[in-house]
Design a protein with these regions (language model features):
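Short Pro-Cys-Gly-centered "Cys-loop" motif that presents a nucleophilic cysteine in a tight turn
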Residues: 1-3, 10-124
C-alpha cells in the first residue's frame, strides 16, 4: 500500500477538512524536506465517507484491517496480527500505538477486553 492509506476517524467540532489539511500538509512538508524535494506530494484530494450505522463501522474496521492481506503485504492472518502499520495488531493486543483508539474499537465487539479482541479477530 505504498500509494494510499485508510484512516478511520471520529470527527470533532473543527471538522474533518481542517484536520486532514493539517495532517496532509504537514506530512508533505516533512517528506519534501527529508527528501530534498518540493511541490505536490499527493495526486488528489483525500476521499471520505460518513459512517452513520453501527454495522457499517464493523465492516469498515474489517475492510481496513484486511487491506494489508489483500495488498500482499501480510501473507496470513497470524502475520497480520504482528503487522505494525495496521490497527489490527493493536486490537489483538500484539502492539500498542498512541494513534489507535483500541478501547473504542473493542467496545463494538464485546463486553470484556479479552472477549472483544477475540471476537474482533474472528470477525475480521
Amino acid at each position: 500500500m505504498a500509494n494510499h492509506a485508510h484512516i478511520l476517524l471520529r470527527s470533532g467540532p473543527a471538522g474533518l477538512s481542517a484536520f486532514m489539511r493539517k495532517l496532509l500538509t504537514g506530512h508533505a512538508v516533512n517528506y519534501n524536506r527529508r527528501h530534498h524535494r518540493h511541490g505536490h506530494l499527493f495526486q488528489n484530494r483525500y476521499k471520505s465517507i460518513v459512517c452513520e450505522e453501527d454495522a457499517y463501522f464493523k465492516q469498515l474496521v474489517r475492510y481496513i484491517h484486511l487491506n494489508p492481506l489483500r495488498a500482499g503485504i501480510a501473507s496470513t492472518l497470524p502475520k497480520l496480527d504482528w503487522y505494525r502499520w495496521c490497527g489490527h495488531s493493536c486490537v489483538v493486543g500484539r502492539r500498542e500505538h498512541s494513534w489507535y483508539a483500541r478501547e473504542y474499537v473493542l467496545r463494538w465487539f464485546g463486553s470484556t477486553e479479552k472477549e472483544s479482541a477475540r471476537c474482533c479477530r474472528h470477525f475480521v
